[in-house]
From Swiss-Prot:
This is D-aminoacyl-tRNA deacylase. A motif (Gly-cisPro motif, important for rejection of L-amino acids) lies at residues 139-140. Homodimer. One of its GO terms (biological process) is D-amino acid catabolic process. An aminoacyl-tRNA editing enzyme that deacylates mischarged D-aminoacyl-tRNAs. Also deacylates mischarged glycyl-tRNA(Ala), protecting cells against glycine mischarging by AlaRS. Acts via tRNA-based rather than protein-based catalysis; rejects L-amino acids rather than detecting D-amino acids in the active site. By recycling D-aminoacyl-tRNA to D-amino acids and free tRNA molecules, this enzyme counteracts the toxicity associated with the formation of D-aminoacyl-tRNA entities in vivo and helps enforce protein L-homochirality.
Amino acid sequence: MRVIIQRVKGSSVRVNGEIVGQISRGLNLLVGIGNNDTESELDWMTRKCLELRLFPAEEGGDRWEKSVQEIQGELLVISQFTLYGDCRKGRRPSFSDSASPSIAKTLYDQFVAQLKDSGLKVETGIFGAMMQVTIDNDGPVTLLLER
């Protein structure tokens, strides 16, 4: 499982020109599910996303001392199978390391449900849809989590 985690001042996702998910201050999570991933990765990834200290204790501060939970931030979760694109050969990425859509959707939905259990506002895109994502990256702070 791979998650690109981005600290944002705001983020939104559109499908067919319509906003389907939108947040203010918090985290944008681009989520890729690999073909070897199981439910065992979900708890660790959920904890990391919710507990990583990526926010300053005070506005304008430079030390990251608070998590998204501690600031009562918001989460925008977007499915992103292309995180498993392999570009080592040829000119076209191979996605053979990505989980099948049915398995990926099940694990993605479980991940979103675990994040929602935190009580934070959680918005999502539409799994498998072509989406336009607008990200107001704060910092910029962008990290890759992999399990």
